[in-house]
From Swiss-Prot:
Protein name listed in UniProt: Protein YceI
Signal sequence extent: 1-22
Similarity section: Belongs to the UPF0312 family. Type 1 subfamily.
NCBIfam families: PRK03757.1
Major localisation: periplasm
Pfam families: YceI
Domain of life according to the entry: Bacteria
Disulphide connectivity of cysteines: none
Annotated localization: Periplasm
Keywords: Periplasm, Signal
Length: 191
């Protein structure tokens, strides 16, 4: 009986310790500590940079068990900004993002794997009415206590998507078939 009680207590402690390791975070967009950026070559001569100004998301981070990590992000595609009003209007049109019909893009992770010091985050990206798997390579920038009594964790992730994979058929030339994604987020741990 003592062995059973001891085993049950040990198992209970192990379960409690394991579940306490994973932490849930809300992306800190209000504090301007998160960015969803992209770049694409312009006719093969230069890079055109842009950002989405309105998005929201959460992530679960467990440094010891990446398989338990999760990422969920929703982007308001009408918030696209390339620092040029007419171009932004064109990007919102049916030629590109078709924001009248598809005002949101979403990313929901399906797996997270450790790759050396990096994390490979694979998930379903829904953009322009099409859902495709995308893998982002992420790096932990840092984590710890903040000056206001909370805890934070920050990551930077990069990936590529092909325009035609998401039913964006406007041809900008051979050097402009893919978009680079550059995402930087800082999350505030939820209590």
């Amino acid at each position: 009986m003592k062995k059973s009680l001891l085993g049950l207590t040990f198992a209970s402690l192990m379960f409690s310790a394991g579940s306490a390791v994973a932490a849930d975070y809300k992306i800190d967009k209000e504090g301007q500590h998160a960015f969803v950026n992209f770049r694409i070559q312009h006719l093969g001569y230069s890079w055109l940079y842009g950002t989405f100004k309105d998005f929201d998301g959460t992530f679960t981070f467990d440094e010891k068990n990446p398989a338990a990590d999760k990422v969920n992000v929703t982007i308001n595609t009408t918030s696209v900004d390339t620092n040029h009003a007419e171009r932004d209007k064109h990007l919102r049109s049916a030629d590109f993002l078709n924001t009248a019909k598809y005002p949101q893009a979403t990313f929901t992770s399906t797996s997270v794997k450790k790759d050396g010091d990096d994390l490979d985050i694979t998930g379903d990206l829904t953009l322009n009415g099409v859902t495709k798997p995308v893998t982002l390579e992420a790096k932990l920038i840092g984590q710890g206590d903040d000056p206001w009594g909370g805890k934070r964790a920050g990551f930077e992730a990069e990936g590529k998507i092909k325009l035609k994979d998401f039913n964006i058929k406007t041809d900008l030339g051979p050097a402009s078939q893919e978009v680079d994604l550059i995402i930087s987020v800082e999350g505030v741990q939820q209590k």
